[in-house]
Amino acid sequence: MLLDFELFDSILPVAESSPRGRMHFDLRTSISEPGWVDSSQRMLNVLTPGTVIPVHRHPDTSETVIVLRGAVEEVFFDSCGAVTERHVLRYGGPCPGIQVPRGVYHTCRCLEPGSVIFEAKDRPYNPEKTEDYL
């Protein structure tokens, strides 16, 4: 599978029509075999300006974010909700990606229409423990 602008463009209309203003695309393609399950978290996220990603943290995993098109701002917070860091990530720019440490509250703000990020996390998805909102 090519992770190209044609793929991104095919997801963009779904993101634009979504009430959330974004759409993820699961990149796990491995077929589960007896005794083995693909527990990775790898996805594309196509974002539109104005999408709101709630401030959250991942208590059990770090998160890698790499911009594949457009630009986003990754914002880190302390446990009281005060901003501690801001980083503009831009495709083709001096800083296209970031590693969000485990347990750090953060959000991602879309800066350009049709921005696309790649996200990966260390641990399997667990809906009861994966995110903790501020």
Locations of regions flagged by a protein language model:
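Short beta-strand His + acidic residue motifs that chelate non-heme Fe in jelly-roll/DSBH
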Residues: 54-56, 74-76, 98-100, 106-111, ...
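Short acidic-glycine-tyrosine-enriched beta hairpin
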Residues: 78-103
